[in-house]
Every structure is written in C-alpha cells, then in structure tokens.
Amino acid sequence: YINRAFQYAYDGHNGQNRKSGEPYITHPLHVAIYLCELNFDKETIAAALLHDLIEDTDISYEDLKKEFGEEVADIVDGVTKLDKIKYSSNEEAKADAIRKMVIAMSKDIRVLILKLADRLHNIQTIEYHQDWKQEKIANETLYVYAPLAHRLGFQSIKHVLEDKSFKILHANQDKEIKDMITETNPDRDSQIESAIDIIKTLLNDNSMSAEVYGRPKHNYSIYKKIVNQGLTFNEINDLIGIRIVTDDVKNCYTILGLIHANFQPVLGRFKDFISMPKFNLYQSLHTTVLTSDGTKMEIQIRTHDMHYRACLLYTSPSPRDRG
C-alpha cells in the first residue's frame, strides 16, 4: 500500500524539482519518514507521500479517492486547504489562522500532524528560497506552526521550528546566544543526562513513582526570556531544565524535599504555584538548584493533570504567564 503510494507520488511529481535542484519526490518522502518515525498508520504515511499532488499536479481529489480510498484523499485534501490559508504579519490574522487549523483538526487531527511534518522539512531546507520568502515562511512557522506543535504535544518539533525561524528572523541575536552558551556552558547535554540519572536513582531509592525529563533551554526560549523579562543571559536560571511529573500533590512536595536535601537550593528561586496557582490556573513547583560543578538547574515538579493543563496554557496572552 505504501509502496504503491510512493510510486504514484513519484510518477505524479516526475519532472518537478525543489528549489535545491533535488527531485521533488524527496520532499514528500522526508515528510513520510518523519511520520514513520512517529509510528503513524499506513493511511497517514500514504497521505504524506501524496500530500502535494492535488496542489502541484493535475491529480484530483477524486483520483486519489479512487486509488487509495476516501480516508487518504480526505487527509490530502485537508492539507491542501490549509496551504490556501492566507497569512498576514499582524497578530490577529495569525491567531485566526490557528483557529482555522483547529477547526480542521476537529475533523481529522492527522491533517494537522502531516502539515507539521511538512513544515518541519520545509524549514530545514529553507536556505534555497530568497530572503523575503524565508522571512515569510519563518514568521508563519514561529507564530502558527510552533505553537500548534506544542498544543499537539510534539515538543521536539516545536523546538526545531522555533530555533530555525529565530535564526532567520534574528540572525545576530541567535549567534550571540550560541556564543554565550559555548563560552559559559558547553557541556549542557551531558550535564542534563547526569542530572536525570541522579534524580531517577534518588526517586527509586525512596520508592517514588515519577517520570523525569530534561532539556537544554533552546535559543528562542532564551531570547524570549531576555526580551520579555528584561534578564541578562547570566540571570537565566533554566538553561538546564528538569521536569518531574508524578501521580499526586503529596508526591510533589515529597520529591521537592528530596531534591533540596540532595542539591543546594538557590535562595529566592523557589515558587509554589500548587498552593498559589497563577491567575491562569497554572500549577507546579519551581525550584533552582546547583549541580556539583555549580551550574544552575531549574526543576519543575507537577502532577500529570497539572502537566496536561500546562500544555494547554501555552498560548495564553501574556508571555510572562509561564514564568
């Protein structure tokens, strides 16, 4: 089935090339590979291979429906309709674009996921476009697709979309941040892995059930914190971040005690948003501690329900809401 979809797409795009000069089929193939890595069903993979045929060739919805069934044809048609949304540079239009895509999502969420994968590959090969086109794509990506990726739970995709867009729109600031990271904290990834191992061992030794995640703060998030909160680079406390998600509120406070007993807390950096939620109902415990080499590390502790709500709150009006 998927092989047949590939051959159909290959034939349909025959003679077409990307801006890079590569055969056009390389694009839908990359999109399909992304979705394979996410373990999507064969219909979604087939739709990924076929997703540009209606827009860029003489092949119609009815042709796809006849060859691959209504389900695949509907997904491709949904992606084609999203491509026709006109974007503007003002915030209201961007918000309206998001609402239109959410409406499309209510019919079949796979349309949006495929579109995210499509945008992920396009932003990674954007250098072949003219500068004005790169800026247009980067703006769309930063204000529409990256928040959408977050809403759908695809954090790694969100970070790539944000950082690639940020590099295009704010190249100088992006380089400054990269240089500062290299100078002050070049071993972040290994520090995070070490911290996760230590915390997991600590929780296991104390029979605490929890999931532990770690991530380096990516460049666009650093930039937002500097701009929105008026911080200097050295004042940012979560260049290394750990999130602990557990079953109930009691566990949150027990884990906090274990963290403070085994790491040195940074004075003035503990915030209890569980007992005193933010006005948008965000809840979590935030603390900043020092690793063995003196590196600051922010730790967030929350329940699964709190984590779910936090994800939904991502696009709240004020950038300060997320602390």
Predicted regions and their residues:
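Transcription initiation cofactors for RNA polymerase, centered on bacterial
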Residues: L53, I75, V79-K84, K94, ...
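Nucleic-acid processing machinery
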Residues: Y1, Y10-R18, I25-E37, A46, ...
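Hydrophobic or amphipathic alpha-helical targeting/insertion segments
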Residues: D63, E67-G78
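Alpha-helical scaffolds flanking conserved acidic
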Residues: D41-L50, E71, I75, V111, ...
